[in-house]
Amino acid sequence: MDPRLTHEDRILHLAPLTEKGWLLVEGRDAIHKEFKFKDFNAAFGFMTRVALLAEKMDHHPEWFNVYNKVQITLSSHDVAGLSQRDIKLASFIEKAAVGASTS
């Protein structure tokens, strides 16, 4: 189990993600982003790549998909907030989205 992010960790690790469009969730220690893809196949392929890593990490996103849009929220339930696992998964998600041809 990774500990909850410290204030210093937040400054260091969340800034690059917020620059890429990740938002802090109001009223909750979590981050959220919506991705838009060319079509459903691209969105589903992206979700599959993310799911494979999430399963290896035993850290699963909250997500919602309609056609070419995927909304993702990350938080670590075991520490009731953000942890390094969320940072690692969000960073991978960014790379996977680029590879899946976001629109």
Curated annotation (Swiss-Prot):
Under catalytic activity, the entry for this protein gives: (4aS,6R)-4a-hydroxy-L-erythro-5,6,7,8-tetrahydrobiopterin = (6R)-L-erythro-6,7-dihydrobiopterin + H2O
The cross-references to Pfam families, in alphabetical order and at most eight, read: Pterin_4a
MF GO annotations: 4-alpha-hydroxytetrahydrobiopterin dehydratase activity
Entry-linked InterPro entries: PCD_sf, Pterin_deHydtase
User: Which UniProt key words apply to this protein?
Assistant: Lyase, Tetrahydrobiopterin biosynthesis
Coiled-coil-forming residues are: none
Enzyme class, UniProt record, top EC level: lyase
EC code: 4.2.1.96
At the top level, the lineage of the source is Eukaryota
Any Gene Ontology biological process: tetrahydrobiopterin biosynthetic process
What NCBIfam families does the record point to? PRK00823.1-3 (NF002018), PRK00823.1-5 (NF002020)
Question: Function of this protein?
Answer: Involved in tetrahydrobiopterin biosynthesis.
Q: Which family does it belong to?
A: Belongs to the pterin-4-alpha-carbinolamine dehydratase family.
How is this protein named in the record? Answer: Probable pterin-4-alpha-carbinolamine dehydratase
Q: Which organism is it from?
A: Hypsibius exemplaris (Freshwater tardigrade)
Lineage of the native species? Answer: Eukaryota, Metazoa, Ecdysozoa, Tardigrada, Eutardigrada
Gene name of the encoded protein? Pcd
